[in-house]
Amino acid sequence: MRADKMSIPGVQPKLSAVLRVSQQSFELVDRGGKFILKPNPPAYEEVPANEALTMRMAAVAGVEVPAHGLLRAVDDSWVYFVKRYDRVGRSGRVHVEDFSQLIGANRETKYDSSLEKVAELIERLCTFPAIEKPKLAQRLLFCFLTGNEDMHLKNFSLWYRDGVVSLTPAYDLLNSTLVLGQAKEESALPLNGKKKNLTRKLCLSYFCKERLGLNESQIEAILKKLSVALPVWRQLIDRSYLSKAAKEAYTEILEERVARLKLG
């Protein structure tokens, strides 16, 4: 367990809501919500705009994400919203388990694992692990590039649909390094025992190739998607609802990680 700081999503308020199209608004509900609304947590700054931006950047890179966006609250503050991917029809549900549940961990022990363990669970539990492993590799690289050092076990999930077990769409993606300031780590879960000073060799040769078993063409395909997305990311950051200072800080984090991965 990490005692030095709290998980951002762990302290971020989450509200259940349904969309009232005719009223062009969300209505808060106790049950049956199809959307989650996330106002800005008091302890941090610009989290909704940060998450909306980062999720959009993920989508541009080909990472599957739920429908999401920003809305203005009555007090003129930003609220992030995201559609629940585990709800279907009027009252249907898709069975979902996060990786913390899969290994019997809890909110206090969600950091007590490793990315190797995540890969192992995908290999053991997914119906088609060869399809899911490149997804995991891409998410790892994306989170590294966008300063997300808070991807713990509860931020990875499997869903069970039509007899097939696979990774859910990505969620809770944000630049946590930007929110928390000078982060001590670069990954919530260790990679070959390391949580900081991650390198291209560690991410690609060790994790993607050795641990996930991806071949060179698969790795190159992932890197190409990220490289193609890079100029669009820069535009998205510049056009985002972050403050000028936050835009500059986000860009600085991104460019340093891009250089380290030798991307683009």
Model segments located where?
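Small/polar glycine-rich anion-binding or flexible loop at a beta-alpha turn
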Residues: 219-230
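ATP-dependent phospho-/nucleotidyl transfer catalytic cores
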Residues: 74-77, 81-145, 189, 205-206
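Catalytic-core segments of enzymes that bind and process phosphorylated/nucleotide-bearing substrates
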Residues: 98, 102-121, 160-217
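A residue-level signal for conserved active-site and pocket-lining positions in enzyme catalytic cores
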Residues: 17, 58, 99, 150, ...
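Conserved kinase catalytic-core segment
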Residues: 43-59, 114-179
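Regulatory N- and C-terminal appendages and interdomain linkers associated
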Residues: 124, 164-165, 232-264
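Conserved ATP-binding subdomain of kinase catalytic cores across diverse folds
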Residues: 1-112, 159
